[in-house]
């Protein structure tokens, strides 16, 4: 008779322990119920990127002096600079400039070391394509400014500022 009583007591203790664990999980769920959502509904909501965000590179053809500093400081020698030496004025003339964003690691060295500031980082981060050859941008594609998502009325922008805790 005693083994039956101890089994019944063990069963009761296990039931109480299971109910306590379920209650703890339920309390955690309820504590998260009144918080704001962490995720955003992309592409209908987009984050406003920070000021120092390193997105697609913007290139100004008229400012470039074809010095190839960007190629030398790039860790993967990515920018392709084609130029021709003009003997009458003894200067380089830029013919073609291209960057393959499928290979680019967006380190920002080319922008930082450019002596004429013809390169700059934009806030554009939507570079996905179905064909990797479309990621090879020439000077015309690099010269296009990205469309601002702030002016698009169909997209709700969300400012991503860190909360300051006191």
UniProtKB/Swiss-Prot annotation:
One of its GO terms (cellular component) is chloroplast thylakoid membrane. It comes from Synedrella nodiflora (Cinderella weed). It is a peripheral membrane protein. NCBIfam families: ndhI, NuoI, PRK05888.1-3. PANTHER family: NAD(P)H-QUINONE OXIDOREDUCTASE SUBUNIT I, CHLOROPLASTIC. The lineage of its organism: Eukaryota, Viridiplantae, Streptophyta, Embryophyta, Tracheophyta. Keywords: 4Fe-4S, Chloroplast, Iron, Iron-sulfur, Membrane, Metal-binding, NAD, NADP, Plastid, Plastoquinone, Quinone, Repeat, Thylakoid, Translocase. This is NAD(P)H-quinone oxidoreductase subunit I, chloroplastic. It comes from the Eukaryota. Binds 2 [4Fe-4S] clusters per subunit. Its main location: plastid. [4Fe-4S] cluster 1 binds at residues 64, 67, 70, 114. The keyword Iron applies. Its EC number is 7.1.1.-. One of its GO terms (molecular function) is 4 iron, 4 sulfur cluster binding. It is found in: Plastid, Chloroplast thylakoid membrane. Disulfide bonds: none annotated. Residues 55-84, 95-124 form the 4Fe-4S ferredoxin-type domain. InterPro entries: 4Fe4S_Fe-S-bd, 4Fe4S_Fe_S_CS, NADH_quinone_OxRdtase_chainI, NDHI. NDH shuttles electrons from NAD(P)H:plastoquinone, via FMN and iron-sulfur (Fe-S) centers, to quinones in the photosynthetic chain and possibly in a chloroplast respiratory chain. The immediate electron acceptor for the enzyme in this species is believed to be plastoquinone. Couples the redox reaction to proton translocation, and thus conserves the redox energy in a proton gradient. Belongs to the complex I 23 kDa subunit family. NDH is composed of at least 16 different subunits, 5 of which are encoded in the nucleus.
